[in-house]
Amino acid sequence: MDNYVLNLLQLCDSTFPTGAFSHSFGLETYIQDGIIFNKETFSKWNKAYIKEQLVYSDGLACRLAYEALENNDMDTIWMLDGMLRAQILARESREGSRIIGERLLTLGNQLYPSSRLTSYVDRIAKGVSYGHPAIAFALISHSLSIPKNTTVMSYLFSSNANLVQNAVRGIPLGQTQGQQLIKESQDFIADAWNLIETLTEDDFGITASGIEISQMRHEVLHIRIFMS
């Protein structure tokens, strides 16, 4: 068995304490608007989120970050960190990504310490960098010698699984339905990974305006169970 497998399983475990369970990234707005109310309506939204948001932001950034690490190009890592920060227009989602990224990075550096992870932690502490889970995941995975393709696919899977679990609580859905959604989304995640492999840096940030607007509107909802 490859040595990295158990580390990767821990990194992608839903109990890994990044705080992702507190963020819906606009999903809760659609729930309160009555657009998402069951398994089928969430599945439709989730496919759009993966294809229109996750692919062109986090997913692509994770791949580009890993490739930069292969070339020992830390300047590109810091540039991607800034691009991800600027690309998230909604304040809550921007802050949510920062918090999740910082927690993933801090815990990752405690479990799998490396000079690059420490450098990222230090830059965030100094306010030079912001922190983002896609960058942190790439850094940790590269330090553990997890292959690039496995890294990007795992990041997509983990991000999707977290959103599904939040849908289970927010809509709400049954736990069995949640697992069905995760299983049913696997082919779509594989398609998303294939698409990411064809993209360039010029494709970064092509995201759906409807999802971004729902993320902006979330902070003025009267009742909320999620932070974004």
Curated annotation (Swiss-Prot):
In the record, what terms sit under GO molecular function?
nickel cation binding
* Location of this chain's protein in the cell: Cytoplasm
GO CC terms: cytoplasm
Q: Which InterPro entries match?
A: UreF, UreF_sf
User: Which UniProt keywords are given for this protein, alphabetically ordered?
Assistant: Chaperone, Cytoplasm, Nickel insertion
Say yes or no: keyword Chaperone present.
yes
- Role: Required for maturation of urease via the functional incorporation of the urease nickel metallocenter.
PANTHER family (UniProt xref): UREASE ACCESSORY PROTEIN F
Q: How does this protein assemble?
A: UreD, UreF and UreG form a complex that acts as a GTP-hydrolysis-dependent molecular chaperone, activating the urease apoprotein by helping to assemble the nickel containing metallocenter of UreC. The UreE protein probably delivers the nickel.
Q: What HAMAP family does this protein map onto?
A: UreF
UniProt lists the family membership as follows: Belongs to the UreF family.
- Protein known as: Urease accessory protein UreF
